[in-house]
Amino acid sequence: MKMIFCNNKHKWRSQFVLIAIMLVAISCNSNKKKAKDYLYIAEQALEENNFEVAKTHIDSIKILFPKAFDDIRAGFDLMQDIRKAENRRNIAYIDSMINVTIDKFNEQRKNFDFVRDKNYQEFGNYIPKLTPSSSTLEQNTLRSGVSEKGVLYLESILSGLNINHSKIKASTPDGSYAESLTVTADGLNYKITTRNKTYEIVRFFGNDDNGVAEFIYTFQESPITINYIGRRSYSKTLSKNEKKAIAQAFELSKTILERQNLTFEKGKSEALLRYLERDKAAPDN
């Protein structure tokens, strides 16, 4: 009787172990199936250009199924495909934006003369037709231009006044103002003396402008006073054409710089795409 009991107990234990093994096997198969489901959803999301959903599901495979090695490797390959697709999308979008800036530039360009002395200038400048250089030297004025690289500059000109000015201040009747940095004699600060007259020309290039051009662009519909600041101060009110010319130069500068930035970003995406494609084509070690 005791022997029969022992046999039944052994049989019961064997059945329990078998059931446990079956449960583990079922669990593993279930996990494997779920990992493949995540991978399938990621593949479908990639086909629909839904890159964030695809990446989220690939990341989930590594977290939820750390032992599903085949699916994790497949997810890595798929992630590379996603990165390539993202860069192709970015390049296409940037190309469309570059075309927009080209159209904008071509329209704005009509308001400018391109001036370049090939003997000593590598790059030329765009000069607003409203304030041509040839007709402004005999005036007390504030003219503008844009380098071929897109850098905006202002030039303050005093004709017949000797104050050694080195900076300017733009202000409106409500007290708002912007003031340039000081441009010293070792910069673009020129003083020309003839037999009958003294001319002062100071160029505020790049950061030297310190927001004066943007201030004039913003408040171009308001009266704007320019103060020439040196040993003493001289003031004048900008004419409508002076304000409009500076506003046009400000917009042209933004367009050129925007195109340059887009071209730079496109180059980065193209370089990354080439890297990903080379990495994919490289034979496994």
Where are these regions (language model features)?
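Short, charge-rich amphipathic alpha-helical segments embedded
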Residues: 55-87
